[in-house]
Regions:
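An N-terminal assembly and electron-transfer interface module characteristic of large anaerobic redox
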Residues: 1-424
C-alpha cells in the first residue's frame, strides 16, 4: 500500500499555447510522442498551425531522418497560404540519441526557404544535461526570431516576458508606466501579427514576470541590448514597493531623456514621478483593505494551504500570507521548479512548524492531520485534502502587483461564501 498515490484529475483548464504570430509548428517525432501535442492543438483550436512528421525505427536506422525533414518543410511551405514568417521545429527526446546538428539543419532550411525563419526547440525530458529546463528553453526560443533594432528606432516601450496571460489592463503597473511616459507594455501573448511581435525588439526595457522569462531576457540583453529586471509573482506589499522603486530607477533615465527631447524640462519629469507614486499609494491601500476583508472572512479557520498549482512561487506566497496574519499550515510542493529556493529556506528556518509536502501518496495525506475546514490555495491541495474552501488560482495568472494582492484576497473572501463539493 506504500506505493498508492492519488491521481489528481485535470478539470479541463485550457493550457495556453504560446506561438509567434504568422508562424507554423512542425513536430518531428515518433507517432506516440506527438500525441499530447496533437491533442492540445485540437483543444486550443491551433490545429491549423501545427504539422507532424513522424518517424519509424526503420527511418532512423536507415538514416532517412534529415531528408524527411527537408521534404516535410517543403511540403508544409508549399501547402500553407500565406507562407509562414517563422517555422518552429520541435524535436523530441529521440533526437538526443540521434545527435542531429540542429544549427546546421536550421541553416540548410533557411537557405532552402529564404523568406522564412526556422527555429529549433527540444522537448527532451530524458536529456542528461539537467541544467536545462524544457519549458524555459522553449519559452526562450519564442524570442529568437527578433532582430536587432538601431538605437534611433527604439521607443519607450517595456516588454513583459515569461507570462502566459497578459498583465490585466486594470493593473497599476500599466498606469505607473504610462505616468512615467512609457505608454506601451508589450507582451508576446498579446501579439496578433508578426509586425507586433517584431516590435518587441524596439522596447527599451524587459520585465521577466516569471522564471520562464529569465533566459529569454538574458538572450535579448545579449542579442538586442535590452536591459531587464526579474519580477516573479509577489504578494508582499513591502517587496512590491522595493521592486517598483527599482523599476522607477531603471526607467528614470529614459523618462528624463524623453522629456528633455520633448523640450519640457525636468519639472515635467518630476510631475510624472509624483503622479506615478500617487498611483502606487492608492493601489497599495486597496490591497491592504482587501487583505483585511479576507482575514475577517477566514476568521478562526486553522489553516491556509498553498500549492505549486496555485503559484509558481509557493514559498514566497506562504511567507506573504504569514506576514499578513494568516495561519499557514502547509505548502504542497508537488511540482516545485526550484525557482523559489530562498523563500523555501527562510520558511523552513523561521517556521519549522509548517509542513512541506513533496509527494501525494496516501501516507503523506494521512499524516498531515489537516481538517477539511481549511482554505486550500491551489487545486492539487484542495483535491487531496477535500478542502471546504478553495479560491480559483492557477500559476499566479492574472495576479500582478498590488492589484494581484487585491484580487487574491477578494477571491479568498469570496470562496468562504460556499463549500466545495467533492465526488466520492
Amino acid at each position: 500500500m506504500s506505493q498508492l498515490s492519488y491521481q489528481i484529475p485535470d478539470n479541463g483548464r485550457k493550457k495556453t499555447l504560446l506561438r509567434i504570430p504568422e508562424s507554423h509548428t512542425l513536430y518531428l517525432c515518433p507517432g506516440s510522442c506527438g500525441r499530447r501535442q496533437g491533442i492540445r492543438a485540437l483543444k486550443n483550436d491551433e490545429a491549423d498551425h501545427a504539422s507532424f512528421l513522424t518517424f519509424s525505427q526503420a527511418d532512423i536506422a536507415l538514416g532517412d531522418y534529415i531528408g524527411m525533414v527537408h521534404d516535410a518543410a517543403d511540403e508544409v511551405l508549399d501547402a500553407i497560404e500565406p507562407t509562414p514568417r517563422v517555422v518552429t521545429l520541435y524535436v523530441n527526446c529521440i533526437d538526443d540519441f540521434i545527435g542531429t546538428d540542429g544549427a546546421a539543419l536550421v541553416e540548410e532550411l533557411g537557405a532552402r526557404h529564404p523568406g522564412t525563419r526556422f527555429l529549433l526547440s527540444h522537448i527532451n525530458p530524458v536529456a542528461a544535461d539537467v541544467r536545462g529546463n524544457v519549458a524555459v528553453d522553449i519559452h526562450t526560443n519564442h524570442y529568437a526570431a527578433l532582430e536587432p533594432v538601431p538605437c534611433e528606432e527604439r521607443d519607450a516601450g517595456v516588454n513583459a516576458v515569461g507570462g502566459f496571460v497578459s498583465v490585466p489592463d486594470s493593473c497599476e503597473l500599466r498606469g505607473y508606466l504610462e505616468a512615467l511616459g512609457t505608454p506601451v507594455l508589450r507582451e508576446l501573448v498579446a501579439c496578433t501579427t508578426f509586425d507586433e511581435y517584431s516590435a518587441l525588439a524596439r522596447s527599451r526595457f524587459n520585465i521577466a514576470v516569471s522564471h520562464l522569462g529569465q533566459d529569454a531576457c538574458r538572450m535579448m540583453e545579449r542579442r538586442l541590448g535590452i536591459p531587464w529586471m526579474y519580477w516573479p509573482a509577489c504578494y508582499d506589499p513591502d517587496e512590491l514597493a522595493r521592486r517598483y522603486e527599482m523599476l522607477g530607477l531603471a526607467l528614470s533615465v529614459l523618462l528624463f531623456d524623453n522629456v528633455t527631447d520633448e523640450g519640457a524640462g525636468t519639472s515635467t519629469a518630476a510631475l510624472r514621478l509624483d503622479a506615478a507614486e500617487n498611483l502606487l499609494r492608492e493601489a497599495r491601500v486597496r490591497a491592504t483593505e482587501a487583505t483585511a476583508r479576507a482575514l475577517a472572512a477566514v476568521g478562526e479557520l486553522p489553516v491556509v494551504v498553498v500549492d505549486t498549482c496555485a503559484s509558481l512561487m509557493p514559498f514566497s506566497l506562504a511567507l506573504a500570507l504569514i506576514k499578513a496574519g494568516f495561519n499557514v499550515a502547509a505548502v504542497f510542493a508537488l511540482h516545485s521548479k526550484g525557482n523559489d529556493t530562498e523563500a523555501e529556506e527562510e520558511l523552513t528556518r523561521e517556521h519549522p512548524e509548517i509542513v512541506v509536502v513533496r509527494k501525494q501518496g496516501l501516507e503523506a495525506m494521512a499524516e498531515l492531520g489537516i481538517p477539511h475546514t481549511c482554505v486550500a490555495l491551489g487545486r492539487d491541495a484542495a483535491f487531496l485534502l477535500r478542502a471546504n474552501h478553495s479560491p480559483d488560482m492557477y500559476h499566479d495568472e492574472g495576479l500582478f502587483g498590488y492589484e494581484g494582492i487585491e484580487k487574491l484576497m477578494d477571491s479568498i473572501a469570496a470562496c468562504m461564501e460556499h463549500t466545495e463539493r467533492w465526488d466520492a
